[in-house]
């Protein structure tokens, strides 16, 4: 599958081949769902904590005798039914992270790349460029040629270019990702995807294996 390649000024300068085994497969919505769920679960801190009846402050003495008062029987004022008592079945610190099978993860990446590549208006391949100044305004001028800033924008890099990443730090709703550090959730929810030529070539090699 071929796509147009644009200069950083927004002019068409050629074409590039997108490997069908990466950018044009049958989309697996199930794998995308599982990958997003996995990524979001791995981000959870899991520090929520409540006190049980054994941890709350207060005496464990029986408030009144079992029989003869006409009141309901109670064993301790730390009972979960009482105000100030412990919490029954409340959350405790836990680890929400889990591993996703490698094949499912790879299928999810290829599926989401195929989903995005199918929309030519919101998926652009751009020639490799540098932001030597590291200034936000220089990167913003390039992005405006391909995307509006009324939604999430993702830029895919072929390498870990720190100057481009530095320039994009102050741009709202912008994610700059290296080809080998992608997240399905970022690609799926991006309104516009801008891929540098080097990123496309690396993805062609990386996911065909």
From Swiss-Prot:
HAMAP family in UniProt: Ribosomal_uL4_B
Protein name per Swiss-Prot or TrEMBL: Large ribosomal subunit protein uL4
Region (Disordered): 46-71
InterPro entries per record: Ribosomal_uL4 (IPR002136), Ribosomal_uL4-like (IPR013005), Ribosomal_uL4_dom_sf (IPR023574)
Similarity section: Belongs to the universal ribosomal protein uL4 family.
Superkingdom of source: Bacteria
PANTHER family for the chain: 50S RIBOSOMAL PROTEIN L4, LARGE RIBOSOMAL SUBUNIT PROTEIN UL4M
Residue stretches of biased makeup (Basic residues): 59-71
GO molecular function, one term: rRNA binding
Keyword line: Ribonucleoprotein, Ribosomal protein, RNA-binding, rRNA-binding
């Amino acid at each position: 599958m071929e796509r147009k390649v644009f200069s950083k000024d927004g002019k068409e300068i050629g074409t590039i081949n997108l490997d069908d085994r990466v950018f044009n497969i049958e989309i697996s919505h199930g794998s995308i769902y599982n990958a997003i769920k996995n990524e979001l679960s791995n981000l959870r801190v899991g520090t929520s904590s409540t006190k049980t009846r054994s941890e709350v402050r207060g005496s464990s003495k029986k408030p009144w005798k079992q029989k003869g008062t006409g009141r309901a029987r109670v064993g301790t004022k730390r009972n979960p039914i009482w105000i100030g008592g412990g919490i029954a079945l409340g959350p405790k610190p836990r680890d929400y992270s889990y591993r996703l099978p490698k094949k499912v993860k790879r299928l999810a990446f290829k599926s989401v790349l195929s989903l995005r590549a199918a929309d030519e208006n919101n998926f652009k391949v751009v020639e490799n460029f540098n932001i030597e100044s590291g200034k936000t305004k220089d990167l913003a001028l390039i992005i405006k040629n391909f995307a509006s800033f009324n939604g999430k924008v993702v830029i895919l890099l072929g390498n870990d270019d720190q100057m481009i990443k530095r320039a994009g730090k102050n741009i709202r709703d912008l994610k700059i990702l290296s080809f080998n550090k992608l997240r399905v959730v970022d690609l799926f929810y991006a309104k516009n995807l801008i891929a540098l030529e080097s990123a496309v070539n690396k993805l062609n090699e990386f996911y065909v294996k």
